[in-house]
Regions:
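Conserved, structured core segments of small domains
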Residues: 1-116
């Protein structure tokens, strides 16, 4: 089995607008998505090498130093599949995709030569 890094993305601007939504409406929508996400995870639990976690604020390190940055990554996971296509197909219909302009990226993980 091959390993794949999965990143769940949503534009920062979309999330900022979502936070302005009526609190009762937002709570109901978030509870619905949590329930759908939990069901999806239970249905696909066999593909996860690491269910991952949410990610926070971003720092960028360059030759010039360290600075704050923003990106659209909300969460990450590690999954196992026979092929890249099979890994990607596993995420079709994922509840995360209900977020406007969201996406899920799946990248094959390769061992670094000579590294443990």
């Amino acid at each position: 089995m091959k390993k794949f890094l999965v990143t769940y993305l949503a534009p920062v601007s979309v999330i900022a607008e979502w936070k302005k939504t009526d609190p009762d409406m937002r709570k109901a929508a978030e509870e619905k998505m949590r329930a759908e996400w939990k069901k999806w995870m239970n249905d696909h639990e066999n593909i996860f090498a690491d269910i991952g976690a949410g990610v926070g604020k971003t720092k960028v390190v360059t030759a010039q130093g360290i600075s704050d940055s923003k990106n659209d990554i909300m969460l990450y996971s590690l999954v196992e599949a026979e092929t890249h296509e099979a890994a990607a197909k596993s995420f079709e219909g994922h509840p995360h995709l209900q977020i406007p302009q969201s996406s899920i990226e799946i990248m094959e993980v390769h061992a670094l030569p000579g590294m443990k």
